[in-house]
């Protein structure tokens, strides 16, 4: 393809749309990151960045964080709501609350909080959904607005700690998820002498569409029904504490792709708010929860991996709907809170690792079968002869299907002992030759050819063995078929020569990335430059900053990867800071209650028993190094 251009690469990988301007492809075919939108001219080539890290002793795979992206996401979301509030003359403000469950890493939380350090009145709070998360935010929320929202199921200790947060100077909203929690709150607040700030989670009838739609609707795991909400109001009235009810919360689910779902959910919840006000409750905060989506595939659609709206449209719809409902009821407009953790964090992190080997289907030249060979092989040779003789376009599909049928029959005959191993191998190579030839002759312009093209792209794709664990670094790709953009980090200035699938290094057949962003759609293979064992071939997995680290598991005892924070200074200098080593072998053994120290003693006993004295020290040293080493592959020499 001689007319290939960088624009073709940008369109082919759809970088312009899913990257939100943070990532791109340079004119030299290198994937770049521009973490600071204020200075878009300052770019880092990810390939060179990774090489610099390796030279500095940071082994791949490495998770690279760009904190300036976090800063931009926080401020752009606040700005979108501020502009919507001004546009619709909304009579209250907006507060962004970060739910730390999305990414609890200290670096991430601190950078999010630091994003508004210069603001006189920060528009930022924190959310906790468990006791450990609450203990964390109690020590960090004062760096922003000191607002803490407590969600999740609660016991007396959780509630007591939340109330202690009020004594520490925080504004802690305890959101009731179950009716039984109210009794505990009333009792603990009385013991501590603290007036609680109560919220309640409404269980809406409306249910948004998406992978997390079970978070909303009448069968939701969380929230109070209309009748239960009225019971809460009655009990608070009886205790002369109705003024404590200050926040209404609802949650449609993470990654809501359709803006109409958001409008409908806000509309229903807005009526809950106004009805509560009319009952005498002092509710003044309207928490829309999560749902603000990330366009993982860049298609701007209603697919589970995308969204059909932008940030401005999201803020405008929430503010507009709530303005109209409050005006209809003649009720004061509440502070709007959102818990948009996925939006804040997804883009800021990219996993960079290396391809350690490939397996390609290379068709061999075949000779006609011997005259005494089974008729089936002669049929396959006839199909190959038709293709090599440039068969009519209309016959291509028929020839392909005949070849597939013949191959299946050959494999069956081999299993019955009626075909030799050599004859089976010949049949497989003949089929492979037919597939390669058909692939080159089919046309995407012919709609009857397209399914066969997709099938052949998958069948003939190279296998790239990539130094990472899907279960540790991209668990949502395995668990819920989440799409993450995947790109080779260099060589994109030339037309891709191959199509490939990415396989991890676990001993599990599920350890494969089976969906790839390709143009304006999702494909089962990825167009890539050819791999060479002579030079490093680096791959980037993008938009992995939300949920993936904390959800990752240690399948095959592959642990946390190395990580690093990278920042571009105002003078354009790249600064690699706070490199954090990933798990060692000893670390992951300890997680599953295996004692590396005891293992070392056992090694010594075995060495003394089986190894000659002059070799013992070297063997023991290698075993010691093995326990201290990275869980991923490092030595390819």
Curated annotation (Swiss-Prot):
One of its GO terms (molecular function) is arginine decarboxylase activity. The modification N6-(pyridoxal phosphate)lysine is found at residue 101. It catalyses: L-arginine + H(+) = agmatine + CO2. It is an enzyme of class 4 (lyase). Gene3D superfamilies: 1.10.287.3440, 1.20.58.930, Alanine racemase, Lyase, Ornithine Decarboxylase, Chain A, domain 1. Belongs to the Orn/Lys/Arg decarboxylase class-II family. SpeA subfamily. PANTHER family: ARGININE DECARBOXYLASE (PTHR43295), BIOSYNTHETIC ARGININE DECARBOXYLASE (PTHR43295:SF9). Catalyzes the biosynthesis of agmatine from arginine. This is Biosynthetic arginine decarboxylase. It comes from Shewanella sp. (strain W3-18-1).
């Amino acid at each position: 393809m001689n007319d290939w251009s960088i624009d073709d690469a940008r369109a082919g990988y759809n970088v312009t749309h899913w990257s939100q301007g943070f990532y791109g492809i340079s004119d030299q075919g290198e994937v770049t990151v521009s973490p600071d939108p204020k200075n878009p001219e300052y770019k880092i080539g990810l390939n060179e960045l990774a090489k610099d890290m390796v030279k500095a002793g940071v082994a791949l795979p490495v998770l690279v964080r760009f904190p300036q992206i976090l800063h931009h996401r926080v401020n752009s979301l606040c700005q979108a709501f501020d502009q919507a509030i001004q546009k619709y003359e909304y009579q209250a403000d907006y507060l962004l609350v970060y739910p730390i469950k999305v990414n609890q890493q200290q670096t991430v939380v601190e950078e999010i909080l630091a994003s508004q350090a210069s603001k006189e009145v920060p528009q930022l709070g924190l959310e906790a959904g468990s006791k450990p998360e609450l203990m964390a935010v109690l020590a960090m929320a004062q760096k922003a607005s000191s607002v803490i929202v407590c969600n999740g199921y609660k016991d007396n200790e959780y509630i007591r700690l939340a109330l202690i947060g009020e004594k520490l100077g925080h504004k802690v909203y305890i959101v009731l998820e179950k009716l039984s929690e109210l009794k505990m709150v009333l009792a603990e607040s009385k013991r501590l002498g603290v007036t609680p700030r109560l919220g309640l989670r409404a269980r809406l009838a409306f249910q948004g569409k998406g992978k997390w739609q079970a978070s909303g609707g009448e069968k939701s795991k969380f929230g109070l029904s209309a009748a239960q909400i009225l019971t809460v109001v009655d009990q608070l009235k009886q205790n002369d504490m109705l003024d404590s009810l200050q926040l209404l919360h609802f949650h449609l689910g993470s990654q809501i792709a359709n803006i109409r779902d958001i409008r409908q959910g806000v509309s229903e919840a807005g009526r809950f708010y106004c009805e509560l006000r009319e009952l005498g409750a002092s509710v003044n905060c309207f928490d829309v929860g999560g749902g603000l989506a990330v366009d993982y595939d860049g298609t701007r659609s209603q697919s589970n991996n995308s969204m059909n709206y932008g940030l401005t449209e999201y803020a405008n719809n929430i503010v507009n709907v709530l303005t109209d409902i409050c005006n209809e009821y003649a009720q004061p407009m509440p502070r709007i809170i959102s818990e948009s953790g996925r939006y804040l964090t997804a883009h800021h992190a990219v996993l960079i690792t290396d391809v350690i080997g490939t397996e390609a289907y290379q068709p061999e030249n075949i000779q006609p079968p011997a005259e005494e060979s089974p008729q089936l092989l002669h049929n396959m040779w006839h199909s190959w002869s038709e293709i090599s003789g440039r068969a009519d376009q209309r016959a291509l599909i028929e020839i392909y299907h005949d070849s597939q049928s013949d191959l299946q029959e050959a494999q069956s005959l081999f299993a019955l002992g009626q075909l030799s191993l050599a004859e089976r191998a010949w049949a497989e190579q003949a089929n492979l030759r037919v597939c390669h030839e058909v692939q080159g002759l089919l046309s995407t312009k012919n709609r009857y050819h397209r399914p066969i093209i997709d099938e052949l792209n998958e069948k003939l794709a190279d296998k790239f063995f990539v130094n990472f664990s899907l279960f540790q670094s991209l668990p949502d790709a395995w668990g819920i078929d989440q799409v993450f953009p995947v790109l080779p980090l260099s060589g994109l200035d030339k037309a891709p020569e191959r199509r490939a699938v990415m396989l991890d290094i676990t001993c599990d057949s599920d350890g494969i990335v089976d969906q790839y962003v390709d143009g304006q759609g999702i494909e089962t293979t990825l167009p890539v430059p050819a791999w060479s064992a002579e030079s490093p071939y680096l791959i980037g997995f993008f938009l992995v900053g939300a949920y993936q680290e904390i959800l990752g598991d240690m399948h095959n005892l592959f642990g946390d990867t190395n990580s690093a924070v990278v920042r571009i200074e105002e003078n354009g200098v790249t600064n690699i800071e706070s490199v954090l080593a990933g798990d060692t072998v000893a670390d992951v053994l300890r997680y599953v209650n295996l004692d590396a120290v005891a293992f070392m003693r056992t090694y010594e006993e075995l060495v003394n028993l089986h190894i000659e004295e002059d070799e013992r020290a070297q063997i023991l040293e290698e075993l010691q190094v093995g326990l201290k080493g990275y869980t991923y592959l490092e030595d390819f020499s």
